[in-house]
């Protein structure tokens, strides 16, 4: 069996694009907490000493946008200009308007439609993916890259590696076998970490600390061997980071948010969007469908696509592919999916409880991935029991 290499990357919560995702979702959380019917399309951008929130929001909630921006930046660790942004003294610009009445009447009839009649907020197609290679039913390359990033933040905030600063990126290359369509990880081929750091630390200490406190606790020993390659801050210096180093924008890390390059992506970002935006709710329901297919033993690996037209409740199409790993034909799995999942946007909101804000619910999704997380707020990760007849093995 010939092996192959596949790579996934991640970025930390202090990466400028991820800062923007978290601000946009913090605004969404605040709106939904006060008014579950809020219509939110909130974008954020940032550059040196400046964060701007802009977009269309229709809500009864009373929102202090500037406070949300500063609180979010502070919680990430942007507390002074030398780490990339000073949450308390940076410029905060706000340019929020109401949702277009044309869109409002077409999608939700100015709140007069029943949930099952609510139309999709826009056209588009979304994909959900699942694979049996990890307990999370997520790709290993993506899981490891994501967990390395989360661990970097953990050891920065708890003081284990006090030289760390908020910005950082990770990348993991995994060697796989293809077992008749199922993905079987063999080993980790390469680990790349580029992390922002202070002026005092040496490259030797960076490498030693990253191996001991970040890589060791995250990557299971069985995947590492003496051939595994480590690139630890290969550029040699990463002091300037965050919005000081690069501009940031909501919605620019859509592969990190999903499956690390596996499966497919329809192109729509998640953060700052309320559940009538099918870019988000549609992607969540097809993840639940794909995960349920694999968890119920219908297949070892699955991708599910759904598509929509603006103002139309029923999906235009639903597609299932199990990459040849299905225990029954894909057309039969598709039938089971259609019988068990309601893809109408208003019903997705109800069935996945997506109008509930607060508890930093959506802000949590905005760093370290929307899928494969063990958190009751991530309702789309709940596996639905699917009834199906096992085909008797031929003698």
From Swiss-Prot:
Q: Which reaction does it catalyse?
A: L-methionine + ATP + H2O = S-adenosyl-L-methionine + phosphate + diphosphate
Family note: Belongs to the AdoMet synthase family.
The record's comment on cofactor binding reads: Binds 2 divalent ions per subunit. The metal ions interact primarily with the substrate. Can utilize magnesium, manganese or cobalt (in vitro).
Residues that bind K(+): 43
Which InterPro entries does its entry note? ADOMET_SYNTHASE_CS, S-AdoMet_synt_C, S-AdoMet_synt_central, S-AdoMet_synt_N, S-AdoMet_synthetase, S-AdoMet_synthetase_sfam
The domain of life for this entry's organism is Eukaryota
Q: Which residues bind ATP?
A: 15, 167-169, 235-238, 246, 252-253, 269, 273, 277
Involved pathway(s): Amino-acid biosynthesis; S-adenosyl-L-methionine biosynthesis; S-adenosyl-L-methionine from L-methionine: step 1/1
Per UniProt, the keywords (alphabetical) are: ATP-binding, Cobalt, Cytoplasm, Magnesium, Metal-binding, Nucleotide-binding, One-carbon metabolism, Potassium, Transferase
Classification from the root reads:
Eukaryota, Viridiplantae, Streptophyta, Embryophyta, Tracheophyta
According to its UniProt record, which cofactors does this protein need?
Mn(2+); Mg(2+); Co(2+); K(+)
Pfam families membership: S-AdoMet_synt_C, S-AdoMet_synt_M, S-AdoMet_synt_N
The secretion signal range is: none
Compartments in which it is found: Cytoplasm
NCBIfam families associated with the record: metK (TIGR01034)
**What is the protein's given name?**
S-adenosylmethionine synthase 2
GO molecular function annotations of the record: ATP binding; metal ion binding; methionine adenosyltransferase activity
On assembly, the entry states: Homotetramer.
PANTHER family to which the protein is assigned, alphabetical: S-ADENOSYLMETHIONINE SYNTHETASE (PTHR11964)
Q: Gene behind this chain?
A: METK2
HAMAP family, A to Z: S_AdoMet_synth1
